[in-house]
């Protein structure tokens, strides 16, 4: 259960998806996932410039701080009821009074615990200030997801997505083929496993 982390995000509002909807669906999912996971990480919709127009057209919006606190209070109570730890991902809002801490989605402490070794990591400097993740290498790439979610910040435009052909599952690349002019460069990596002995 420790190796499985449930994410409930992005939390956004519309005529259909109101606070009551999120409270009900969160409880339904928590009941189903209880015992299979120990933690749920939530995040509220972020207004990235490239998604604003699509959100507005679809009638979707983020939550005010008051709405965030009201929903978080209900979700926190539900999480406790089902034995789940609730944390936020890269959120400035402080919800410790509701029993909700800040998460590290790339959590060096958890990774060290499940792999039974201590890891020497640093905070990922390429993320937002509120992000607590350890430095990592993302295996994804921008402008490659064909799902077309309105709230997705990873694609620049629907028009650009239409130009992507379906990926080849045998290709070493995410959504195309290696061309003769392409240059493949191996990345220099260092092991994160600490070799330093611990006294306690």
State where each predicted segment sits.
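Active-site/pore-lining binding-face segments in mid-to-C-terminal subdomains
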Residues: 72-81
């Amino acid at each position: 259960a420790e190796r499985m982390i449930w994410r409930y995000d992005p939390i956004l509002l519309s005529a259909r998806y109101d606070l009551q909807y999120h409270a009900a669906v969160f409880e339904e999912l928590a009941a189903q996932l209880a015992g299979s996971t120990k933690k749920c990480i939530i995040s509220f919709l972020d207004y990235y410039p490239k998604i604003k127009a699509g959100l507005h057209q679809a009638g979707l919006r983020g939550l005010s701080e008051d709405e965030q606190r009201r929903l978080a209070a209900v979700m926190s109570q539900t999480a406790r009821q089902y034995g789940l730890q609730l944390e936020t991902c890269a959120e400035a809002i402080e919800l410790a009074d509701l029993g909700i801490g800040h998460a590290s989605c790339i959590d060096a402490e958890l990774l060290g615990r499940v792999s039974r070794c201590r890891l020497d990591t640093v905070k990922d400097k390429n993320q937002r200030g509120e992000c607590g993740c350890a430095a990592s290498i993302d295996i994804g790439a921008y402008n490659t997801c064909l799902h077309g979610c309105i709230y997705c910040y990873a694609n620049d435009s629907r028009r650009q997505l239409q130009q992507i052909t379906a990926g080849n599952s045998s290709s070493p690349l995410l959504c195309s083929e290696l061309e003769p002019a392409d240059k493949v460069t191996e990345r220099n990596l260092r092991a994160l496993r600490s070799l330093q002995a611990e006294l306690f």
